């Protein structure tokens, strides 16, 4: 096990962002995420009965009421686990959070539909599908299609695809970039960077230090860690199956065309390229699971240097 916990296990995520003692971490992260937009002064964790009612939703959402230094209030939902139909689910969870605020007993009243804005922040610690997001940070707001002008601040989605964040430690300029670097690489770090530049990273180091966990905390963390690895393994298997099916269909089509056109060389190149891309996809998922460079190289069949280039 590494020196620091994996922040994307349910237990690790809750320890760093979902506890009263770690509120300063969450406030600092939100302020760096939304820098130059608003400044969170305080936050309150929402009542447990307001959290998702079904088993597959629990553990993936951290719900908080936030208040800015200008008196504005809004709700933040933070999600950190992949699920099927991920984007659709985030929309449903956000709409649920809005509907929970509507006073159903006063539906005819104008005040019944005055609700706090809901910001949904999603950590995607896996390679996004091509039909989801294509860059590290994707901000979605309600805006006019033609003018691009925002028409309401009531709903906002921020998707953070960590595998698409490529900055090295020395390339991180903003505090937000430093946060993302630390969270992405935390489990593999031997020391916490940026502690001399910002005090909050010293607090993060204290709470994330795996050697400070009690026996009970360690057992809970270890169980949560296995859940993450099982989920990642299932994702990798599903993607591998889909690729193999696609490659088989492509090879069959290529053979048919090759017989007709004599393109044996093209078929061979296609098979080689397909296998190479499959190995890279497997390596990316293994990296997202927190495995070491050597373990990923062994599991994917790629050279160590090529695995390093995928980080």
Where are these regions (language model features)?
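Short, charged alpha-helical interaction segments and adjacent helix-coil junctions
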Residues: 2, 74-79, 180-311
């Amino acid at each position: 096990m590494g020196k620091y916990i994996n922040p994307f296990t349910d237990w690790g995520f809750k320890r760093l962002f979902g506890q009263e003692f770690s509120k300063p971490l969450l406030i600092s992260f939100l302020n760096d995420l939304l820098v130059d937009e608003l400044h969170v002064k305080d936050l309150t964790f929402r009542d447990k009965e307001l959290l998702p009612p079904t088993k597959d939703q629990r553990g993936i959402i951290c719900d908080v009421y936030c208040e800015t230094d200008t008196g504005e209030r809004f709700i933040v939902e933070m999600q950190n686990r992949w699920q099927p139909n991920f984007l659709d689910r985030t929309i449903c969870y956000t709409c649920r959070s809005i509907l929970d605020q509507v006073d159903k007993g006063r539906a005819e009243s104008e005040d019944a539909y005055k609700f706090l804005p809901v910001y949904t922040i999603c950590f995607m610690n896996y390679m996004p599908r091509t039909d989801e997001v294509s860059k590290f940070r994707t901000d979605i707001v309600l805006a006019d299609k033609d003018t691009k002008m925002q028409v309401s601040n009531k709903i906002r989605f921020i998707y953070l695809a960590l595998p698409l964040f490529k900055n090295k430690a020395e390339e991180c300029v903003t505090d937000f970039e430093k946060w993302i670097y630390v969270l992405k690489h935390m489990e593999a770090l031997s020391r916490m960077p940026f502690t001399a530049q910002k005090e909050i990273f010293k607090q993060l180091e204290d709470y994330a230090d795996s050697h400070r966990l009690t026996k009970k905390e360690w057992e809970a963390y270890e169980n949560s860690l296995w859940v993450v690895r099982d989920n990642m393994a299932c994702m990798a298997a599903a993607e591998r199956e889909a690729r193999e099916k696609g490659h088989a269909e492509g090879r069959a089509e290529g053979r048919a065309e090759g017989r007709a056109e004599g393109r044996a060389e093209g078929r061979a190149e296609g098979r080689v390229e397909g296998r190479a891309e499959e190995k890279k996809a497997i390596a990316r998922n293994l990296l997202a699971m927190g495995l070491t460079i050597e373990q990923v190289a062994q599991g994917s069949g790629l050279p160590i240097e090529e695995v390093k280039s995928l980080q």
